[in-house]
Amino acid sequence: MPRKTFKKLTTNDELISKVNPKNISLMEGFLREKSIRCAELTIKNYRSDLLVFFVWVLEFCENKLFTDIRKIEFSNFFSYATETMQWGSAKFARTKSTLSSFSNFIEKFYDDVYPEFRNIILRAVDSMPKELRREKTILTEEQVWDLLRHFSEKKEYQLVCWLSLAIGSGARFAELLRFTTDIIDENNLVFNDIFLETTQTIKTKGRTKSGKMLKKYIIKDIFLPHYERWLIERQKIMLKNGKEHNFIFIKKNGDIAKGSTVRSWCVKIEKYLEMPFYPHCSRHFIVTYLSRIGINADLIIELMGWSSVEMYKIYNDLSAKDREWKDLDKLKDSLDNDI
């Protein structure tokens, strides 16, 4: 079954056209300044968050200029967001951060126009306790191997190739669609010839406009057989439709696959599993799987391209009871000797 998150649209072109033009002008200046170093998706999210807020100001706060909005009015907006729009903690935190960044921008660049203005967001709005909005899916090894087998038997070769890349590399949703045939070389092996290393870097999530460029590591035996089988079918589709490009994943007409293509595969996987499935759970799976079989955390962090152990802790779903604790042998020996 699909994961469900409440979503209520509060903006449209007609309402946006009525928003205080000074607020729109400030927003556009903010986005231009941020676009120098922020990724396109970050800019898109900034714009979305600000427009939702400005439409609320239009409807409930007399279309005030942003610099005139009081602390209680910011608080009222976030109350409305949680009670009426049913925002979760992640959306709440992101929008709060957006409004705070926007305030800092005005304070820094428009101090001559609004000399009395100060960023009051952090003081006016308390953080929302983090909560799990969606049921977390923890895949077992048996489920993953069965998925690959089942969809191979169904001749869903592209779906299987995508899934094997997702669980074999731990790459994110957007990153998986950036993989191309020219960065996969079956002879470019590392770490005892167990992992394929991409021949070039790909754009991963990062704070800068260009993201973080990293080479990706893929467990060869999980991915390569399914990749090679899909390439045969892919070539047939490309020739039939007269298309030429090197992206691994494609639509039925040979065009480059989009997020909607992947989401359709996720629906098929969910129906077979009879439980929620989303691309990110494959990232949890590979980290947990490697941890369970005893791979050192330092190597896992290197494979994932992380800069700290904190991300490892987030994605490792092993409970304390699942892990092997060598120190327990010392306790057992002590009990055997002392009792």
Spell out what each predicted region is.
Residues 110, 166-194, 298:
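Short, charged phosphate-coordinating catalytic segments
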Residues 1-12, 330-339:
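C-terminal secondary-structure termini that scaffold catalytic or DNA-interacting sites
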Residues 164, 268, 283-307, 314:
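C-terminal catalytic core of tyrosine-transesterase DNA break-rejoin enzymes
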Residues 28-44, 48-134:
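N-terminal core-binding DNA-recognition domain of tyrosine recombinases/integrases
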Residues 219-274:
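Active-site/catalytic core of tyrosine-dependent DNA strand-transfer enzymes
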Residues 178-224:
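Conserved tyrosine-mediated DNA breakage-rejoining catalytic core shared by Y-recombinases
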Residues 304-329:
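Catalytic-site neighborhood detector that most strongly recognizes the C-terminal catalytic loop/helix
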Residues 141-173:
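Basic, Lys/Arg- and aromatic-enriched nucleic-acid-binding interface segment
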